[in-house]
Amino acid sequence: MNRKTLAALVGAIVLAVASSGVALAAGSGPAVTVQIKSLTKTLVKSASVHGEKGSITKGGTPRGKCPGNTAAGALDAATHGKWTGKYYASVPGIFVTSILGVKPSGSDFWEVLVNGKASNSGICAIKLRAGQRLLFKIAK
């Protein structure tokens, strides 16, 4: 095999390995479906996402306190980071204050339903499982 052919072959292999690594780095963990609804409209109809690598650090959350492979990571992926929250060490977790610019009014709040059932856990404690359906909606 001549040098040019060998160099081209090695280059193609390196490129293939590098591009597959980039695809893997885009998400972490199993695929879940995220839907987001305000009181009056659907903000995200249905997005298939993976959690995120590392930690979610919204609202002053210390690194490592909210893993990216949780509902918080799925929310972050589905909204491209366009949500806000406040970290509470006593819970510990993030209380969601707005999603895609929508803030609940009065005593309303963002809640998460997992496979159609209201979760008793915060978004940092809901570990992602393949095929899971997450609905973030404003509750009264």
Regions found by a protein language model. Give the residues of each.
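Ubiquitin-like/PB1-type beta-grasp interaction modules and other compact soluble beta-rich domains
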Residues: N2-K140
